[in-house]
C-alpha cells in the first residue's frame, strides 16, 4: 500500500473528488493537499435542459491534510487532479506546479479529471502528449 496525492481547492467538483478519494482509499493511503491546510468547499454541476453552460451548486466540504508547500512529491505513487472550477485558480500555485512537474519527470501516474487538465497545461508537462479532457478545455491543451 502506497500513498496517493489528491489535490483539492474551493470549487472542486464533488464527484471528481469524492470517487477517487474513496476508491483509491480502498488500497492506498490518500493524502489530500491544497493551497492551505483547511476545509474546502466542493461544488456540484448539473446540465439543465435549455442551458448552454453547467449550473453550479454548493456541494460538500472536504478537509485537506497538507498545504502544497509542505508536500514532498517523492513520497507518493500517483497524483489525482479533480475537475470543477478549482483548477482555474490552482493552476497558478507555484508549489502545485512543482509537484506536478515532479510526477511527470519521474514518470509516475497522473489522473486528470475534467478541468484538471488546466493545471497540466500551465505546468507545461503535456506538450506532445495525447490527453483527454472536456471540449471546453480543448484550447488549453492544444
Segments predicted by a language model, with ranges:
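Extended, subdomain-level signal for the structured scaffold at the beginning of enzyme domains
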Residues: 1-106, 118-130, 138-142
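Short, thiol/selenol-centered motifs that function as redox-active sites or metal-ligating centers
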Residues: 113-116
Amino acid at each position: 500500500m502506497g500513498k496517493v496525492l489528491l489535490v483539492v481547492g474551493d470549487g472542486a467538483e464533488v464527484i471528481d473528488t469524492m470517487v477517487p478519494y474513496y476508491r483509491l482509499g480502498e488500497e492506498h493511503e490518500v493524502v489530500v493537499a491544497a493551497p492551505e491546510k483547511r476545509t474546502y468547499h466542493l461544488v456540484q454541476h448539473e446540465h439543465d435542459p435549455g442551458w448552454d453552460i453547467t449550473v453550479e451548486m454548493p456541494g460538500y466540504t472536504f478537509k485537506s491534510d497538507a498545504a502544497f508547500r509542505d508536500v514532498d512529491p517523492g513520497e507518493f505513487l500517483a497524483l489525482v487532479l479533480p475537475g470543477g472550477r478549482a483548477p482555474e485558480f490552482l493552476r497558478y500555485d507555484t508549489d502545485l506546479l512543482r509537484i506536478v512537474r515532479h510526477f511527470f519527470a519521474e514518470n509516475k501516474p497522473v489522473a486528470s479529471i475534467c478541468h484538471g487538465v488546466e493545471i497540466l497545461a500551465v505546468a507545461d508537462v503535456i506538450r506532445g502528449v495525447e490527453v483527454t479532457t472536456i471540449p471546453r478545455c480543448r484550447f488549453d491543451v492544444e
